[in-house]
């Protein structure tokens, strides 16, 4: 697509940025609402979500694929690591079952972003 990001990727980045910014704010502002065992660690997790949401938001605004692809790769890695570690914690019983929906959403974003990244890659780059 002439070195430009697709509409599908841009929409995905926008939804990703909005969702994880809200989720991150909830962790930072009200870790008790997230049933945190350790509020300080929950706030750090929230800050990480806010940082990744900011990166996705900035990538959404950028149209050149060459300037967006590294951000997309980082988001994919983050979502894979998030989904795997959360699922591990849930299955081991250390995290409340209420965390399944965001864990599944993280896995969905990882798959969706990976599929869009593969589709966006320009042959020969």
Task: Name the predicted role of every residue range.
Residues 22, 81-84, 108-111:
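Transmembrane-helix signature of multi-pass solute transporters
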Residues 18-23, 39-61, 73-81:
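Core segments of alpha-helical transmembrane spans in multipass integral membrane proteins
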Residues 1-19:
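Cytosolic juxtamembrane helix and N-cap/initiation of the first transmembrane helix
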Residues 62-67, 84-101, 117-119:
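Membrane-helix boundary connector in multi-pass membrane proteins
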Residues 22-35:
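Short membrane-interface helical motifs at transmembrane helix boundaries
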Residues 108-125:
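Membrane-water interface at the C-terminal end of transmembrane alpha helices
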């Amino acid at each position: 697509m002439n070195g430009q990001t697709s509409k599908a990727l841009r929409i995905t980045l926008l939804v990703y940025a909005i969702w994880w910014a809200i989720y991150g704010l909830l962790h930072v502002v009200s870790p008790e609402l997230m049933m945190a065992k350790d509020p300080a660690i929950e706030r750090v997790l929230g800050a990480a979500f806010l940082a990744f949401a900011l990166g996705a938001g900035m990538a959404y605004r950028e149209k050149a694929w060459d300037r967006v692809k590294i951000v997309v790769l980082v988001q994919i890695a983050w979502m894979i690591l998030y989904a795997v570690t959360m699922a591990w914690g849930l299955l081991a019983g250390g995290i409340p079952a209420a965390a399944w929906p965001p864990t599944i959403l993280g896995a969905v974003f990882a798959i969706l972003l990976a599929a869009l990244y593969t589709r966006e890659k320009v042959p020969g780059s």
